[in-house]
Amino acid sequence: MTQTDSKATQGDQLPGGILMKAIVYTQYGPPDVLQLKEVAKPTPKDKEVLIRIDATTVTAADCELRSLKLPIWLRLPIRIYLGLIRPRNKILGQDLAGEIEAVGKEVTRFKKGDQVFGWTGFRLGAYAEYTCLSEDGVLAIKPATMTYEEAAAVPLGGLNALHFLRNGNVQSGQKVLIQGAGGSIGTFAVQLAKYFGAEVTAVDSTGKLDMLRSIGADHVIDYTQEDFTKNGETYDVIFDVVGKSSFTRSVRSLKHNGRYLLANPRLSQMVRGRWTSRRSSKQVIVGAASEKTEDLLFLKELIEAGKIQSVIDRGYPLEHIAEAHRYVDTGHKKGNVVITVE
């Protein structure tokens, strides 16, 4: 159970004493560091909107930022950005969906009452009743066909999947394999690769295979029973979402001019990837999704056209977010874990 503290920390309370509920963490560590507190309700600046959040998510990325259990090469840069000893930004959360409650005086794209969904990126702040975002941020009107919970599950997974598949130049008729296909990024990658016309092989654990078939995977592989790098198949694109595939064997499983996409690379994979890309016809591509509103709008169009959907495994109320983090830490979630904010 998330701990509750009804006192705002010093300096948090705004004139007038307007407070909101938020999940706060003041140290890195296990899910129990997450505490339900009352903090100052933010006020939008001239070019910002104030969003009343109805739903957010718990992703593997949120858990990594909470615990700092990251690849070695990322730990120091992330600590420098987030806070060396303790987090500077004490409210996690990147995905959100909700309603605009107020707008700054220079805002033109949105108005009060608009139902929106968006991504805060490393600004974080979505584990709360309210947050402010720039009107030029990754924010758009919510798909008309989706609930707040379904819409909140789109941004991080959808934007990352779209980023990598575009960088991998996925084309109609190509063979694409997605390792770790059952998570938030992977489920969107399967659907987007199918939309782009690819023949998709989805790799994950036994309990996720039926779900992966249901969202369009042409072939599924249970990694607990079969190593895809040893079945003799070759692929135009291999997208490793989770960083668990063998670098050497994956590269060997690529066709001539194939692309190996790494969403969560180890340092050794990055070094070897540069060498492989320079010395062979095969390309190794790493990186993170850029924050582009037009990409979110593209995903919205596909959603409203019925081409892609969010996959939701479980839902929790904000007060039980520590329990949600414990579940995501197991690595067994199917698609997304959604948090409702009331």
Which residues fall in each region the model found?
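A structural motif shared across PLP-dependent enzymes of the aminotransferase-like
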Residues: F122-E135
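C-terminal hydrophobic helical "lid"/dimerization subdomain
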Residues: Q3, K7-G17, K292-E342
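Glycine-rich phosphate-binding loop and adjacent beta-alpha segment
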Residues: D204, V242-I308, T340-E342
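Glycine-rich beta-strand-centered segment in the early N-terminal region that forms part
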Residues: A40-T57, P71-F122
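Short glycine-centered segments of the SAM/dcSAM-binding site in methyltransferase folds
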Residues: Q115, K175, G258-R259
